[in-house]
Amino acid sequence: MGQKGCPIGFRTAVTKKWRSLWYGNNQEFGKFLIEDVKIREFLKKKPSCQGAAGFVVKRMSGKIEVTIHTARPGLVIGKKGAEVESLKAELKKLTDKDVWVEIAEVKRPELNAQLVADGIAKQIERRVSFRRAMKKALQSVMDAGALGVKVQVSGRLAGAEIARSEWYKNGRVPLHTLRADIDYATASAETTYGIIGIKVWINLGEKKAVPAANHAGAASTAAA
């Protein structure tokens, strides 16, 4: 089953932390979940968040805290913090709640699956050969110290009439092993022939289980 399921969801609360941290009763849960999705979709479209690797949403008594994980913190912060203040104002308007924005820098972007997938997508959109983009990504990930990496692209590759999938793999990527720290992400490239889907798996080694205190007693959700 590890081959078919999402590696992140498969390991959530085992070796992966929740991406949304809050409690909601039966009446609030659906509302909070939809609000989380709106926040993420809004941030993904912002130019200042283009280098973002992910978002964590935390709720505390009428207040929302959004942590943006990015390889380019200066772009998100803006000149004298202007961009962050703008994000706060727009998110407050979207949610009708006070929103606090935190910035967390991704120290090693070559080992972040989302940033690698986005990089491949941008290259394909610039008409770089998909095979060249995939092989270059594999090499940079392995050079950064990963134990294994797998990259898959799907769609009308190189303008072919029939859609297909191709993948390259280097090293070990054990999808069934729960203690294996597998980072996984998807991205899409918009081309003149249609949408090209990209999937990236990166094996970062073995990891200890997440402490129970991080998820005990919380009806959290791992919305992407």
UniProtKB/Swiss-Prot annotation:
InterPro entries on file: KH_dom, KH_dom-like_a/b, KH_dom_type_2, KH_sf_prok-type, Ribosomal_S3_C_sf, Ribosomal_uS3_bac-typ, Ribosomal_uS3_C, Ribosomal_uS3_CS
Any one GO molecular function term: mRNA binding
A GO biological process held by the record: translation
GO CC annotations, alphabetized: cytosolic small ribosomal subunit
Keyword rRNA-binding among record annotations: yes
Keyword terms, alphabetized: Ribonucleoprotein, Ribosomal protein, RNA-binding, rRNA-binding
All copies of domain KH type-2, residue ranges: 39-107
Regions crossing the membrane: none
Family, similarity comment: Belongs to the universal ribosomal protein uS3 family.
Annotated function: Binds the lower part of the 30S subunit head. Binds mRNA in the 70S ribosome, positioning it for translation.
Complexes and interactors: Part of the 30S ribosomal subunit. Forms a tight complex with proteins S10 and S14.
Matching HAMAP family: Ribosomal_uS3_B (MF_01309_B)
Protein name listed in UniProt: Small ribosomal subunit protein uS3
Organism: Chlamydia trachomatis serovar D (strain ATCC VR-885 / DSM 19411 / UW-3/Cx)
Gene name for this UniProt entry: rpsC
